[in-house]
Amino acid sequence: MKWNKYSIQTTTDAVDMISSALNDIGIEGIEIEDNVQLTKEEAKSMFVDFIPDLPPDDGRAKVNFYIDSEEDDGSMLEKVKAELEDLRMFIDIGEGTITESETEDKDWINNWKQYWHTFTIGDLFIKPTWEPETEEMKGHAVLSIDPGTAFGTGSHETTRMVIKQLQKYVKDGDEVLDVGCGSGILSVVALKYGAKHAFGTDLDPNAIIASEENAEQNNIDKKQLEVIEGNIIDDKAVKDACGYECYDIVCANILADVLEPLSTCIHEHMKHGAYFITSGIIDTKENEVAEAFKKNPELEIVEINHDGEWVNITARRK
């Protein structure tokens, strides 16, 4: 099936009104393109591999919608133009021009799989669930994940750096805390390298489901990995559930703006001599996060690593 894609050139202030108008005339599946930065609250709730730094918001935006090319007789486009003219009477919609292009409907659910194959980080093999284990993998740790459902796949620089640090610092029998655990793959990796138990926290309830699925896929006993929803920074119930001074390793692959307040209190959950492994830090935020770590007298930075424009900071509790 082919689709006609229409893009309305407008302003960020007009996006909501235009989207509502399109919905009112029967258009669904609206797509918005802009450079509006996330608020701090929005950022805290997003636990993906990374969030790219956008160019400055210049007030411009695109609202895209799609019409089946076989059913597109031009009548819907005329309705859209009429709606835009009506909106001009009340708000500034900017250019309000519409450009057209054609796109082909593909099996997006499965076609991307042809580009995703097994890769390694150190001696860890990370493979998609549809690929079998090979002779080469025998005797090595293997992480099997479904990239279609996981929050993070391990391929991004931030995740890769944390995994390398886990390979370096995890010891047999360790207790691990995974803050902002997302898909739980860092916890699963730690368990594969000898950790006894991992406890994860995340603001997104879907993280619990994703972590459970990844644990099951990797033959991790349910008792070895626990995940709860909540904010470890300021929710006492979550802090109590995690426990105090009981972790050998704490990992957090989250945004710099969250790592800064986390660094003021994370030592409460760490044993003396435990490691705090972090990433999700864009290089422009490195000094800011490092200074936040240094302000906590309980922590000392032992490593700072770079991969592309991303940074890992590993600290130890004194």
Curated annotation (Swiss-Prot):
What domain of life is recorded for the organism?
A: Bacteria
Q: Which SUPFAM superfamilies match?
A: S-adenosyl-L-methionine-dependent methyltransferases
Mind listing the GO molecular function terms for this protein? protein-lysine N-methyltransferase activity
The record's annotation in Pfam families points to:
PrmA
Enzyme nomenclature, EC number: 2.1.1.-
According to its UniProt entry, one GO biological process term is: methylation
Signal listed as a keyword: no
Q: Where does S-adenosyl-L-methionine bind?
A: 159, 180, 202, 253
Keywords on record: Cytoplasm, Methyltransferase, S-adenosyl-L-methionine, Transferase
Q: Which family does it belong to?
A: Belongs to the methyltransferase superfamily. PrmA family.
Q: What does this protein do?
A: Methylates ribosomal protein L11.
Note the PANTHER family from the entry.
ELECTRON TRANSFER FLAVOPROTEIN BETA SUBUNIT LYSINE METHYLTRANSFERASE (PTHR43648:SF1)
What is the designated name of this protein?
Ribosomal protein L11 methyltransferase
